[in-house]
Structures are given as structure tokens and as C-alpha cells.
Amino acid sequence: MLLCTYIFFIFVILIFNLKEIYNTKHKNKTKRMKKITSFLISLCIVLGFSEVQSEIKLTTSLELGSDFTFYPKPVASDGKVIVDWGDGTKKEYNVDGMWNKKVNGTQVGDTIRIFSPMQTFDCSDAHVTSVTIIDEPDLTLLDCYNNEIERTNLDISGALNLEILNCYNNPKLLFLNLSAHKKLTTLDCRHDKSDKSDPDDKGGITTIILPSEGSELENITAYNNDISSIDFSGCPNLRYINLEGNALMDINVLSLTNLRKLDIRKNHISNLDVSKNTALEKLYCDDNALTELNVFANTELMDLVLSLIHISEPTRLLSIS
């Protein structure tokens, strides 16, 4: 829609200026040249506004004047990284990817802005409170773990080709919208809970929205959060799921025919159907509300951990506890 708007404005300017140029055909050439110049300047302005620049925005809980370090891998072969540390001044750094892999500076304003296109980006362990990714189509790996990212403040909508997201141990993060990230293969958003009396520990993520179809997701590690439901129907490639210690009442994994490991310990699940998960090798489902479990179809199952219930015995089960 935005692109169409720009094209419309360009068209209007074009018609207006051509009309003016035509109407002045009997006037002197100097005036006609001014009209042409005016048109070209207007066109350049519109095109300039239409250009979207790659950018990563960060806010932190650090006091102004504090040192801040991040680890980028830029797309540019010269390793150029441009940073605004918060005062509107852009500074250029060179990251060669071998000896100098980090960028270090002093935060002088509320928002740190990094303008270079990235392949990978690491801002972990840095007191980051928000991350916003804008037009980073080459970004495939984002590490922002062990931070203080708040509620919905992880915006990766500008990194649709992201393959690996490590955002674990952000105790204030509550929401992850990954509905457009079909190329994501690995998600680690686990929550290694701190002291329960810690007022900053909100209990972990409550909502994860996955793609409704066509997802390439293979691994999800999301234990010790507060997730009550999650839809895997658009993620047929999932192989490993760890949702231990959440608030799940039920879980549907019937469409996950490639599933190898499922860990749903310490939830509130009363019914579990794994009849279609014939590739399943490891199943951990103790500390739930299960009263019965049918694993007759799970002939590859080798490791089963569950509370004391009635089960139908599989053929290749090597251990049960």
C-alpha cells in the first residue's frame, strides 16, 4: 500500500510538471529548463522518502554514559557498521569478522540505532529492554538472550528471513509474534526462572504465535514459561519440542509426523494423543493430569517418562520411569 501511494504521488507530479512544461513552450528556454529541474528535484525527493533503510533499534536500562557492546556480522564485505549512540551523530566502525567482531561505544541517548544491513546480530547480556528490526532481509540469526526485553518489545517484523532466534531468559518478555517467520528453524525462548520473589520476573512468555502454514520450524525450546496454548498446525517439520513447566491444559501434536522428542512435563494436560507421531523416540510427560496413555503406534519410542498411569506397551521401549 505504501509503495502504491509513492507511485501515485510520482505520477501526479509527473503529469503536473509535464503540463506546465508544455504550457510554456512559447516562452524562453530558461524557464522551461527551470520547470524540468523542478520536476527532477521533486521526483528525487519522493524517491528518497520511499527508500527504507536497514536499521536495528535498541533501548536499554543502562544509565546514559554507560558502555554498550554488540556483535554484528554485516552484509557488506568491508565490514562497515554505522551507529547512532543516541545523539543523532552517526559513527562508522569496521568489523572484519575475524579479529574484530564487536562494536563498543557509549550510550548517550535513549535509543541506539544501527543502520547497516546484517547477516547476524548479537546483543545478548546487555541490559536491552527493546529490539526493533527494520528492513533486514539478510538477517538469519538474532541473539538477544539474557536481557530485560519487556512485554511485546521484541519486534522482528523486519527480519522475515530469520532462521534462528535465541531470546531466552528475558523475564519481562510476554509475547512473541512469529506468524510471518516461515523460514525460522530454531526458536529458543526458554525461561530459567530466578527467585520467585523477584518482582521483575513476570513468569515468562504467555503467548507464541507461529505461522499458520508453511513453517520450516524444527526445534522449539520454551520451557519454564506461562504458555497456556500453542498451535503447531502450520509447523509440520517440528522434530523437537520442549514445553516443560508451562500452563498447558492440552496439546495437539497429531500433525507433527516428524516429531522425535516431546517434553511436556509439569503442565496440566489430561489427554495426550500421539498415535500419529510414529517417529517419536523420546516422550516426557510426567507431572500432568494424564490417567491413560496409548503408545501402541509409537514403535520407535525408546525413552518414556511419565507419572503412574495405565499405558499400552510399545514394542521397542528401552526405559520407563
Per-region residue spans from a language model:
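Hydrophobic alpha-helical signal peptides and transmembrane signal-/tail-anchor segments
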Residues: M1-N17
